[in-house]
Amino acid sequence: LSLTLVFPISSQAYNIMRTDNGSLVYGLRNSSITFQSWNGLTQETRWAIDYASRQWNNRTGQTKLFHSATQHGEANKLPTHDNRNLITKMSLTGTRFADFLMVTGPVFKLYGSKYQICEVDIVINSDFPWRNNGSTAGYDVQNVMTHERGHMLGLDHTDVAWATMIEGTNKGDTWKRTLEQDD
């Protein structure tokens, strides 16, 4: 009797972001990105954003995502190329993003022969109920923001169930708050 076991050498639960023409995006242009939160967000929401960033920083062993203590006052702002990295909250009703919980808008440019991210904005859709405690009355900010931070670093959605970068979530979900081995 012969038994052969086959194990994959590595398993990752992510896909690399691509441009509209299919070119790979090779992560951040700079070694880190500093972002500002909107001053209309609660302190608990800013903490949730910070904790989401720490998940990725801890995984990479570097401070890739730096949450500035300075806040911005620009509400109702869709992602735009203005050389700033802003997190804001607004209604997305009437836009092509109306069904999205959050929208991450990366700007990538060609540097030499590689596309790299030079700027990223995130909009929290205020048309959905948000919570910071895992309550089933709303979507958990840290849960969704950890996923969006992956996009900020150049990752795309995956088909791997229970990976942080899988598309979609439910009210009260908190399992995407932390990264797993495959992320």
Where are these regions (language model features)?
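Bacterial N-terminal signal peptides
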Residues: L1-V6
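Zinc-dependent metalloendopeptidases
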Residues: I9-D183
